[in-house]
From Swiss-Prot:
It is a single-pass membrane protein. Belongs to the glycosyltransferase group 1 family. Glycosyltransferase 33 subfamily. Keywords: Endoplasmic reticulum, Glycosyltransferase, Membrane, Signal-anchor, Transferase, Transmembrane, Transmembrane helix. It comes from Schizosaccharomyces pombe (strain 972 / ATCC 24843) (Fission yeast). Pathway: Protein modification; protein glycosylation. Residues 95-116 dip into the membrane without crossing it. This is Chitobiosyldiphosphodolichol beta-mannosyltransferase. It is an enzyme of class 2 (transferase). GO terms for molecular function: chitobiosyldiphosphodolichol beta-mannosyltransferase activity; mannosyltransferase activity. Participates in the formation of the lipid-linked precursor oligosaccharide for N-glycosylation. Involved in assembling the dolichol-pyrophosphate-GlcNAc(2)-Man(5) intermediate on the cytoplasmic surface of the ER. It catalyses: an N,N'-diacetylchitobiosyl-diphospho-di-trans,poly-cis-dolichol + GDP-alpha-D-mannose = a beta-D-Man-(1->4)-beta-D-GlcNAc-(1->4)-alpha-D-GlcNAc-diphospho-di-trans,poly-cis-dolichol + GDP + H(+). GO terms for biological process: dolichol-linked oligosaccharide biosynthetic process; protein glycosylation. One of its GO terms (cellular component) is cytoplasmic side of endoplasmic reticulum membrane.
Amino acid sequence: MLVLKIVLFLSLVIWFNLKKRTDKKRIIVLVLGDIARSPRMQYHAVSFAKLGWKVDLLGYQHPGSSVGLFESHENIRFYPIPSLPAYLQPKNRLQFLFLGPLKVLHQFLALNWALFVRKPASFLFIQNPPCIPVFFIAQCLHILRGTKFIIDWHNFGYSILALKLGKQHTFVKLLKIYEKYMARGAYAHLTVSKRMKDVLQTWGMNPCYVCYDRPPNHFTPIKNEQKKQMSIKKIPCEYNPSSTKLLITSTSWTPDEDIYILWEALNEYDKTLDTPKLLVLITGKGPMKEEFSQYIKKHPLHKVRFCMPWLSIEDYPQVMACADLGVCLHTSSSGLDLPMKVVDLFGCGVPVIALSYPTISELVHDGENGLIVNDSKALSKKMQYLLTHANELNSLKLGALKESEYRWDDEWNKVIPPIVQGSN
């Protein structure tokens, strides 16, 4: 406790000493997560850098992962946050309840240290979730240094915690209160959907802007047959496009994306007579991946093969562009966010079948760039129909290609510069 008091005291001293030396066109982009798996925050960092801002990008960098997109930009400096020790990473609900406070304390000290050694910035740009302890630190930084903070709302922290503990758990209710009131000091709020913006405004969050995810320039359709053949070679499984259709889905292997819905749909597909063979490419990392790997070994299908690689940043968009059809299993813990994986597929000109939830229609327009279904049976029927009716599939593909024309830079440059430039 004494050490903690000393650290906090020194932190206050440093903050006060540096408060008057704020760099007006410097921004700290903070990711309390694996930077390699935070593409939207990477895109923000690159976009700020293109606008002439000096960007300090902070986040976890796990061993063997590539930080990728921003490495070569002269205006961006990446500073890794000290990673959580293995003993602070809970493996079950009971450990979560006991280790949670220690995890937050470690993050609090690590973030304070990471922020102290940075040159003062005019803005701190943070994502939510996670909101603990980030919102509190952002408030302190604003009070003591004058740094304004902007929250980029990807989802709600309390709704994700509810997946583990249940909606009525005391911790979930307390987190919702913390999230609602600690965020009110933000200079501005960004959301990934209009429905999310509407909810935040009922919470008193203003000003609030929608900044939709849009595909960056490295997610593009393949229009040259020679390039397509080169991209097909990057698929780490045996694949013959003349006899097999390629279906792709990306998942975080978490409870809000039930991969078994896809398996049930494919199991029904496997029983049909006049449908083509399928190679199902499932990308992503997460806690349920090994469990599903064992499941499909015990329950093999005849005309459906699975491939579950972890693709590099360079190979991922090229492989995605080879797909005939994409599937999105995301249902959202809050019902208010939108899946970036669909944006990536549209960027590559690939149509999508998506599970229905309240906000998905802001992105997937049923019958135009994809289809929306309610369950595994409907998913199976739509897959069967599209993969045996080329005209219908091509019509949706044209819709996806049209979506690919509106890019991240177009959306970002429309929304963000007026927010930050108006403060200087």
